[in-house]
């Protein structure tokens, strides 16, 4: 066994090309596979960027190097210093002949999970051994695309003059008055894990920040057990002053469009590896009102009445009709939180919207109430006590501008981008009703 000592990686696997014939390289990673055939050994080394083949001919390497190569096991951690040799018959037009191999760590055998993907495993098994599962190239591709998504979103917000903020995740009361909260002991008080940064975003509008965004955890104590729900999720939230819901929708369109464009440009290998049918959407998405969505659902045989939230059957019906990315707008006021602004001409309808991808909701937003008296009235009308929102309401007494915003589910959006049908595939260590480890 060796320490890394004075060795340092000089290249990732993807950086080595046939034109480097004769050049010395130092590679580091995992043994993806090993074949020893008499006086010849083939070692496939895997790193973050892909795989590369090292060929170990007994007559061209010293005896110690050949013996080390023969005894390698799958997933051993190795460092290989060798020379690039152009070879048209090799898989990538070259191979690496080792000068020295250092075994940095041995992997136990048998492996509880096969990162080479030759043996499939159920998702629960994969999540139990997630550290092995994420070695798989296709799983890494999901998270590289997710990383590119977050990078693109931050860049778009920065280009548009937004300030990134961090709001508390330990809170004294519910954001929306709901019961979907995780209570915790906070010294001598009861506290909760935050279910949304919504109230804080609005308070920052009163503070004159004008445009803010946050990318952070939210916690929902919902007893769902579906492929699209988790109890800990990443939410991408934004809020803007002196705008309405249409401006907020336009900003969301820009964020989503730029994600598709940036991923196509920066992650073509991952798109190919996942065999994604990649299409950059139009810059402006289709829109359908809630009333029109209800009509579509009823026409397709779904039993639903105006004023009800859309059921799964209704979402599927509308998704089948609309396809791709689209907004549902002008929701019934009774279906939305107290801070949503009703339409002036018809207070039964509010200035709220959802962004859908087929049948999946990925974002929700609205123009907010910015008048103190109306906000207090809305809170009371929903059976909540305004006193519970005292610190929030105070921000509306001393000059709150009109404002609007939205929250985009990062995990669900990653599902859409990578064409996964289970949200757990897009979260490193998902938390649901059954899973609290690893």
Swiss-Prot record:
Mg(2+) 3 binds at residue 361. It is an enzyme of class 6 (ligase). GO terms for biological process: aspartyl-tRNA aminoacylation. One of its GO terms (molecular function) is aspartate-tRNA ligase activity. Residues 198-201 are annotated as: Aspartate. It is found in: Cytoplasm. Its EC number is 6.1.1.23. L-aspartate binds at residues 176, 220, 364, 368. ATP binds at residues 220-222, 228-230, 361, 409-412. The record marks 91 as: Important for tRNA non-discrimination. It catalyses: tRNA(Asx) + L-aspartate + ATP = L-aspartyl-tRNA(Asx) + AMP + diphosphate. InterPro entries: Aa-tRNA-synt_II, aa-tRNA-synth_II, aa-tRNA-synth_II/BPL/LPL, Asp-tRNA_synthase_2, Asp/Asn-tRNA-synth_IIb, NA-bd_OB-fold, NA-bd_OB_tRNA. Aspartyl-tRNA synthetase with relaxed tRNA specificity since it is able to aspartylate not only its cognate tRNA(Asp) but also tRNA(Asn). Reaction proceeds in two steps: L-aspartate is first activated by ATP to form Asp-AMP and then transferred to the acceptor end of tRNA(Asp/Asn). HAMAP family: Asp_tRNA_synth_type2. Belongs to the class-II aminoacyl-tRNA synthetase family. Type 2 subfamily. Homodimer. This is Aspartate--tRNA(Asp/Asn) ligase. It comes from Methanococcus maripaludis (strain DSM 14266 / JCM 13030 / NBRC 101832 / S2 / LL).
């Amino acid at each position: 066994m060796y320490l890394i000592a004075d060795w340092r990686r000089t290249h990732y696997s993807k950086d080595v090309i046939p034109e480097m014939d004769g050049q010395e390289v130092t590679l580091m990673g995992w043994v993806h596979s090993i074949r020893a055939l008499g006086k010849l050994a083939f070692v496939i080394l895997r790193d973050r960027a892909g795989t590369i083949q090292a060929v170990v001919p007994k007559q061209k390497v010293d005896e110690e190097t050949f013996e080390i190569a023969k005894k390698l096991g799958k997933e051993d951690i190795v460092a290989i210093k060798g020379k690039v040799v152009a070879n048209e018959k090799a898989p990538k037009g070259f191979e690496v002949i080792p000068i020295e191999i250092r075994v940095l760590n041995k992997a136990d055998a048998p492996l509880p999970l096969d990162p080479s993907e030759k043996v499939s495993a159920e998702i629960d098994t994969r999540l139990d051994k997630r550290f092995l599962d994420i070695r798989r190239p296709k799983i890494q591709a999901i998270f590289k695309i997710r990383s590119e998504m977050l990078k693109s979103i931050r860049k778009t917000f920065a280009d548009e003059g937004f300030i990134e903020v961090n709001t508390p995740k330990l809170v004294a009361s519910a954001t929306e008055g709901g019961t979907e909260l995780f209570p915790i002991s906070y010294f001598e008080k009861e506290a909760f894990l935050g279910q949304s940064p919504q109230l804080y975003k609005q308070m920052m509008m009163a503070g004159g920040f004008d445009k803010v965004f946050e990318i952070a955890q939210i916690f929902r104590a919902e007893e769902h057990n579906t492929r699209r729900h988790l109890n800990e999720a990443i939410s991408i939230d934004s809020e803007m002053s002196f705008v309405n819901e249409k401006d907020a929708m336009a900003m969301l369109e820009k964020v989503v469009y730029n994600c598709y464009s940036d991923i196509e440009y920066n992650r073509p290998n991952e798109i190919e590896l996942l065999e994604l049918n990649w299409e950059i959407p139009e810059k402006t998405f289709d829109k359908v009102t809630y009333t029109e969505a209800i009509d579509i659902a009823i026409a397709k045989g779904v039993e639903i009445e105006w004023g009800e939230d859309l059921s799964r059957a209704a979402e599927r019906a509308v998704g089948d009709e609309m396809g791709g990315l689209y907004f549902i707008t002008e929701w019934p006021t009774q279906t939305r939180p107290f801070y949503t602004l009703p339409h002036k001409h018809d207070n039964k309808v509010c200035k709220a919207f959802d962004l859908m991808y087929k049948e999946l909701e990925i974002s929700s937003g609205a123009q907010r109430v910015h008048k103190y008296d109306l906000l207090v009235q809305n809170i009371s009308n929903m059976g909540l006590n305004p006193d519970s929102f005292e610190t929030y309401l105070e921000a509306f007494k001393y000059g709150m501008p009109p404002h609007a915003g939205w929250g985009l589910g990062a995990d669900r959006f990653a599902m859409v981008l990578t064409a996964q049908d289970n949200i757990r595939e897009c979260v490193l260590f998902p938390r649901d009703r059954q899973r609290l480890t690893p």
